A protein has these predicted regions:
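Mature extracytoplasmic domains of secretory-pathway proteins
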Residues: 47, 51-89
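Short, exposed beta-strand-loop hairpins at the edges of beta-sheets
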Residues: 110-120, 126-128
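Bacterial signal peptide processing site
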Residues: 19-21
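Post-signal peptide N-terminal segment of mature Sec-exported envelope proteins
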Residues: 26-43
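Sec-dependent N-terminal signal peptides
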Residues: 5-13
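Charged, amphipathic alpha-helical segments
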Residues: 42-62, 101-114
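Short Fe-S-cluster ligation motifs
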Residues: 89-107
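C-terminal motif of bacterial Sec signal peptides marking the signal peptidase cleavage site
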Residues: 15-17
Length: 131
């Protein structure tokens, strides 16, 4: 009887020790709106909306042969300094990986309108940040 209890105890201990740990729940992506020249801190990293290098998106109220593209530069600092060039058009790079974070440009506001020029200071980059 003692041997049977000892055997059951050993089997229970072995089963518990072999059980896999439940994987950590993934962190949901964080969406932020970053004004031109503004910065945000995320996990020890600083993300700054540094520049709009081009904006050839098709203006609202017009017909274009393609949707166009806007390109922005993010200055990334934390563990080293890097510049990320992100685009609104999916044919070009929209995401950048930096220090275990994936940064994606989802939208650039405002959208161009026919006959109007956008002041660089009115741009807002909509980004998702995911670890």
């Amino acid at each position: 009887m003692k041997k049977m209890l000892l055997l059951c105890g050993c089997l229970a201990a072995l089963t518990i020790s072999c059980a896999k740990e439940k994987p950590a729940e993934p962190t949901p992506p964080k969406t932020i709106e970053l004004k031109y020249n503004a910065a945000v801190e995320e996990g020890g990293n600083r993300i700054q909306f540094a520049a709009v290098t081009s904006d050839s998106r098709c203006p609202t109220g017009t017909q274009c042969s393609w949707a166009g593209n806007a390109e922005i530069v993010l200055e990334l600092t934390g563990d080293g300094n890097q510049a990320a060039i992100l685009n609104t058009n999916s044919q070009y790079q929209q995401s950048y990986r930096y220090n275990d974070y994936n940064i994606t440009l989802k939208e650039l506001k405002p959208h161009p309108e026919a006959g109007q020029t956008i002041d660089v200071n009115s741009y807002v980059a909509v980004l998702t940040i995911e670890k």
